[in-house]
Every structure is written in C-alpha cells, then in structure tokens.
Curated annotation (Swiss-Prot):
A lipid is attached at C222, C223 (S-geranylgeranyl cysteine). The keyword Membrane applies. The modification N-acetylserine is found at S2. Belongs to the small GTPase superfamily. Rab family. PANTHER family: DRAB11-RELATED. This is GTP-binding protein YPT31/YPT8. It is found in: Golgi apparatus membrane. The lineage of its organism: Eukaryota, Fungi, Dikarya, Ascomycota, Saccharomycotina. Gene3D superfamilies: P-loop containing nucleotide triphosphate hydrolases. It is a lipid-anchor. One of its GO terms (molecular function) is GTPase activity. GO terms for biological process: autophagy; early endosome to Golgi transport; exocytosis; protein transport; vesicle-mediated transport. Pfam families: Ras (PF00071).
C-alpha cells in the first residue's frame, strides 16, 4: 500500500529545528522558505511556531516540518521538547553581529546534548545583504563548519539569496542518511524511522502528522 492509500500527502516527514540568537532572522528564514514572505518589522518569537514545505527527492514526497522558537533565554523553557524527534537543525547567526556567531558554539552544544546523535546540522550566516556591515569573515565560519562537520551557507532572508539552497542541502543530507540507514538494514525499515524520520505508514517516532500545514503552537499547545 502506498502512503496515499492512508490519506497522507507525503512519504517522509522530517522535523527540522532552527536555533540561534534572538534577531538573527530565524523566523524570516522560515517564512521565506515556506511562504516566500519577509517581514522587516517581525517581532521576537514567543513560544514555538512551525511551518512546512514539501519537496520531492527520488520521486518521494518529503515534508519538511520546520520549527522556530525564540532565541531569547527567557522564552526558552522548552528545550528538550523542542529538540525531540528532530532529524535536522540549522544554527543561524547574523553575519553583521559577531556575538551571534560566537554563540554558535553554545547552540551546537545544546543541540548535541538534546538531539539525536544522527541529527544533520547546517550553519547559516544570515543577512548576507548587509555586506557593508560584515563582522564575521566567511572563511572563519567555513572553517568552524568543517571542523564540526556542519553544512555551511550564507543566506539573506531579505533578498532570498541561498535560502532554498540552505534548506534543500540539509533536507538532502537527511534523506541520504535515511536512505543509507534503510540500505544498511536491507530495506526492512522502508517505512520506518531511520534517524527519527517518520513515514506515514510506518511507526511514528515523536512527531505525528498534522492536518494543517502552518500552525502556531504557543505555550500549552506546544510539543
Ligand atoms: N537585512 C536583513 N534583515 C533581516 C534578515 N533576516 C531577518 N532580518 C531582520 O532581522 C530582524 C529579526 O528577524 P527575525 O526573523 O524576527 O529574527 P529571529 O531570529 O526569529 O528572532 P527571535 O524570534 O527573537 O529569536 C527583523 O527586523 C528582520 O526583518 C536578512 O536576511 N537581512
């Protein structure tokens, strides 16, 4: 039976989390990728939000469910629930703010402590349109990414530069990990939960499919 027979509109669901300091542009990267929207006056995220976009790889419909939360410490009482079931993460900093880059070490440690060992991770230097205010050299971030086995892209949520590329590279990497895991298991888990990815007609790990595409999950409704 195919997943369509079960009434699902995707074959695999990947939970991806966005992390990074407040104001680096996480919410705008999410809205640019999922809705092609940008908001110059966006307010700090309160609670947790998510939005989805479905892509096709190898003829399979991959639904990326991307979670966004506030970078501010005072809103961050949800850490372990936020990371639970994530198969990918993007650590975002602002290329014009060196403190946001220096804090990437903290975000990487928090991710490693809370997420699955197999989680695929990308580093994003956002606001590349602010080249005249650049405070973080590209080469420095590239080296940091290589040393920590992270994908690396500089993006602009404002003018869309590399936003699709950054998300698609991460989703592709997750997909390769899932495919490899299935091959290692002789494909016996074709509907299964390689690295925590959930398939509609396989066992659901920590994420259940949602009926609505874009949801807000504030406070008690969250996680
Ligand atoms: N120039 C420029 N500004 C951006 C870009 N992305 C986001 N911004 C602006 O940066 C500010 C913060 O953006 P948000 O997307 O709310 O940042 P955030 O990381 O979600 O912030 P928190 O929710 O507080 O964690 C807003 O004024 C955005 O308009 C970008 O690529 N270029």
């Amino acid at each position: 039976m195919s997943s369509e027979d079960y009434g699902y509109d995707y074959d695999l669901l990947f939970k991806i989390v966005l992390i990074g300091d407040s104001g680096v542009g996480k919410s705008n990267l999410l809205s640019r990728f999922t809705k092609n929207e940008f908001n110059m006056d966006s307010k700090s995220t309160i609670g947790v939000e998510f939005a989805t976009r479905t892509l096709e790889i190898d003829g399979k419909r991959i639904k990326a469910q991307i979670w966004d939360t506030a970078g501010q410490e005072r809103y961050r009482a949800i850490t372990s629930a936020y990371y639970r079931g994530a198969v990918g993460a993007l650590i975002v900093y602002d290329i014009s703010k060196s403190s946001s880059y220096e804090n990437c070490n903290h975000w990487l440690s928090e991710l490693r402590e809370n997420a699955d060992d197999n989680v695929a991770v990308g580093l994003i230097g956002n606001k590349s349109d602010l080249a005249h205010l650049r405070a973080v050299p590209t080469e420095e971030s590239k080296t940091f990414a290589q040393e920590n086995q992270l994908l690396f892209t500089e993006t602009s949520a404002l003018n869309s530069e590399n936003v699709d590329k950054a998300f698609e590279e991460l989703i592709n990497t997750i997909y390769q990990k899932v495919s490899k895991h299935q091959m290692d298991l002789g494909d016996s888990s074709a509907n299964g939960n390689a690295n925590g990815a959930s398939a509609p007609n396989g066992p659901t790990i920590s994420l259940t499919p949602t009926p609505n595409e874009n949801k807000k999950a504030n406070g008690n409704n969250c996680c």
